[in-house]
Amino acid sequence: MPWVQITLSATPENSEVLEDMLLLCGAGAVSLLDGADQPVFEPIKGTTPLWQDTRVMGLFEADTDADALLEYLSNGWQAAFPSLHFPSYKLEILEDKDWERQWMDRFEPIQFGARLWVCPSWKPVPDPTAVNLMLDPGLAFGTGSHPTTALCLQWIAEQDWQHKTVIDYGCGSGILAIAAVLMGADQVMGVDNDTQALTATIDNAQRNGIAVTTIPVCLPEDTPNKAVDVMLANILAGPLIDMAERLSELTKPAGLIALSGILQHQADAVIAAYEPWFNMHTVVSKDEWVRIDGIRHS
């Protein structure tokens, strides 16, 4: 079947936003390419997953309304980056070829810490004795390839999750929530303002044999006012700053917090927003992104 393909110019700082918007629009696949046209779907451990001149490519079914797609992308871009012009783009009609299958074939497992692997659901796991998170990227808004997701997964791989309750705020694909449960958490609430993300979280949890009662999902306005042991939030610096008080209310005294989706130059502002409630003691960076960890004041 033919496909509609859109390719947008991007940088490491804005590529994830474009990825998310394309997936929210119903892209069958999203890939990242450098100037040499080599796609990166999952980076080899220790390598840099994005280039300064990155192209984000989305693949859509032939009946996609291109004008509506561009309008959605433009509005989303303006909301995320009000001072930047919408990036240059190219729209193409691709003739019959199984581009989605080609993309799936190149998605590889990636390891975090000593025990945690994120694996495509259609490939054999590298280590059957490890904690293996099976993911279908076609249902995902995060696969572990972006530095912010990788930073959070690395943190999850290092924690003791026994008997812990958790909120994954901005759950997207549910990858962080699922990882926490597989590592031993009792329950993780997945929260997102997009219903498609909630559906993706449910689907990916079921793929990993996790009951909906273990990873319940809800919209932000429906989040129960019940504090948890661990707060995860991989979104963007602006919303994180705006929600500092709310996330503190949802975290138990002496509870842990891990925040990402933050550029290096934004770290101080995020730390300042959370310091009234947390001891923000660790900043870990990957490429131009950081993760900030902390402990709720007792």
Segments from the language model and where they lie:
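Short, flexible coil/linker segments at domain boundaries that flank nucleotide/cofactor-interacting
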Residues: 1, 84, 161-162, 183, ...
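N-terminal auxiliary segments of SAM/dcSAM-dependent transferases
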Residues: 2-127
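Surface-exposed loop/turn positions
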Residues: 114, 164, 254-255
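A short, charged helix-loop
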Residues: 131-137
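Conserved SAM/SAH cofactor-binding pocket of Class I
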Residues: 139-224
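S-adenosylmethionine
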Residues: 159, 191-298
